[in-house]
A protein has these predicted regions:
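Acidic/histidine-rich catalytic neighborhood of metal-dependent amide-processing enzymes
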Residues: 3-5, 10, 14-31, 35-110, ...
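Active-site-adjacent substrate-binding region
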Residues: 102-186, 191-196
């Protein structure tokens, strides 16, 4: 084939709407999260804020949290909380074992209470669940492997609870999402910024 170690190879990206509210494409992780944040930021009522809110986009999460760690080191203050917005790899696919990371698509975004690099304090979990419930937003609570950019803030003692959307077939050319989960995620991000 003429392909050698070190050669760059890419798959073409194509967003495909499926039946109902499902869509498939390559690289929803983390383009979908960026979209949810941008929509929340555009909808944010700046006059409603009585505290500082910072939205951060960083790079190289998959190869050592390079961007997030640099931001955490440079902020110069201690945020009350960090909510990394990232994929939640769901075990709700037909062939997956459903005893871990079971978060069905179309049933709302996911608050990550536990992963391989963090344990969210109970008060943060309860506060976020209360916020969502008070606004009738569906929110799933999940535990999974892996980690997020929020881990870059751990060394500073800053509590973090990643939030995201359930996704099947992560890091493949056919990642699968339910667009309703992204809409609710954007609403949740806006609520966190304005009210919590």
């Amino acid at each position: 084939l003429g392909v050698r170690i070190g050669d760059t190879v890419t798959n073409p990206k194509e967003f495909v709407r499926l039946a109902g509210t499902r869509a498939t494409a390559r690289s929803f992780d983390d383009r979908a999260g960026s979209t949810a944040q941008l929509v929340a930021l555009q909808s944010l009522d700046l006059n409603a804020l009585d505290h500082e809110v910072i939205f951060i986009w960083s790079t190289e999460e998959e190869v050592g949290l390079v961007g997030a760690t640099a931001v955490a080191d440079e902020l110069g203050f201690t945020p009350a909380r960090v909510h990394a917005v990232d994929t939640f790899v769901s075990s709700a696919a037909p062939v997956d074992r459903q005893n871990f990371a079971f978060t069905p698509l179309g049933q709302g975004p996911v608050a990550r209470g536990l992963d391989s690099s963090s344990v969210t304090p109970r008060a943060i979990i309860d506060g976020l669940l209360e916020l969502a419930d008070g606004h009738n937003l569906p929110l799933q609570l999940g535990a999974t492997n892996g980690g997020t950019d929020g881990t870059g803030f751990r060394d500073w003692g800053i509590p973090h609870m990643p939030i995201g959307w359930p996704l099947r077939y992560s890091h493949s050319p056919i990642e699968l999402i339910d667009l309703r989960d992204l809409v609710v995620l954007s609403d949740l991000i806006q609520l966190i910024a304005e009210e919590w």
